[in-house]
Amino acid sequence: TLGMGFIFVKDLENLKNEVEKLSLDTQKLDLTILDFTGKSFFSFAIENNIKLTELHNSVMNILKQFSSYGDADFAMFNESEKVKDDVGLVKWVSNFNTEHAFDLYDPHITLGKGEKPNFDFPINFTASKIGLFHIGQRGTCKEKLAEFNLKYFFSR
């Protein structure tokens, strides 16, 4: 999760354009999954680094232009979604910019619930894309709205 916010449909294309511009100036990120976090509903804990923090801050600065923080409500969720009834999730997203972003950023990938599979941590990977998603249960990525390739840099 690089950022969260409630976006009105009328602002979605402008948001996509801004995130695409950002992606054209952002190189792929080498990241490390440290472990799982959570108990019944879990995430991968991602090791923070300067480039990830910079990307998060840039994404949040874009989201602040288009997001409705603090005054969001259940009506902003898709009617078919159970998430619209999740008071905790609405509060989480409504307050993301003040309670979970910038200096409070905790990089993670929300996975879901159930039994945790066995992995040998740490796991290194390269993030080559960023995306915009419609939120699903417990803050998971439900529906991809857009995806953007990050810029390649080659060392010499």
What is the predicted role of each segment?
Residues 1-156:
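Histidine-dependent nucleotide/RNA phosphoesterase domain, centered on the 2H-phosphoesterase fold
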